[in-house]
Amino acid sequence: MPANRTLIGPPAMGIRWICRGAGWILLLAVVLFGGCGEKAASVTTALPPIDVKADPVQDPSPTQEKIRIKLKAGFVDLVPVAHYRIAAVVASKRKYTSGWGAEVMPFDLALVWGRLTDPDVAENLQIKHDNTRLAWFRIKGEEPPVSFEYAMSHGSNNHLIPATPNLFRAIDRDVGAKDRVVIEGYLVNGEGLIEGQTVRLKTSLTREDSDRGACEILYVTSLRIGDRVYR
């Protein structure tokens, strides 16, 4: 566990955003961890190919231990609310480098699974991030192969919190668009104090929402890209 993370307590149908980040209150200088030029360590596995057709798996969290993230001007305590595993294709990736949100959640990944990974659908699907932590989904064509509702329930924008410096480096340098990935960890809520002001984070717990607050906030403990596993 990195030095700034400590456990607290015992162990063309239209364009819409799929979600918005959890209402930034302050903007502060950013601290990014991970050594310059240092490669992420991984283990090569003989696991079967990544199946991106199934829905994400979400179970009650086996622990509610708080995870404290120390920031330049305060802290945020994360509370796991669900164990989460998602196998998907990376549609878009964005790194953030300013504000307390970037200190806590430096990466956003827009992920798709199910029919959205099929070539006939993927070629008609446009997904991109903007600088407000939204992921925009657009389906092209007068008769798209899937409904907009299907696209909204088989794609998600994920605010990633790497649990280790190695995972930070892996997400930063090794994850790219069109990669097939498996991400495991915990969906978390958060509350903290920054420059005397209370800040809060709340994760989505369903894949059916598509508005503000619909992002998954994911504390990442394991990442697989192809046959490589990072922790």
Which residue ranges define each predicted feature?
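Bacterial N-terminal signal peptides
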Residues: 24-32
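Bacterial N-terminal signal peptides that target proteins for export
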Residues: 6-25
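OB-fold and OB-like single-stranded nucleic-acid-recognition modules
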Residues: 34-231
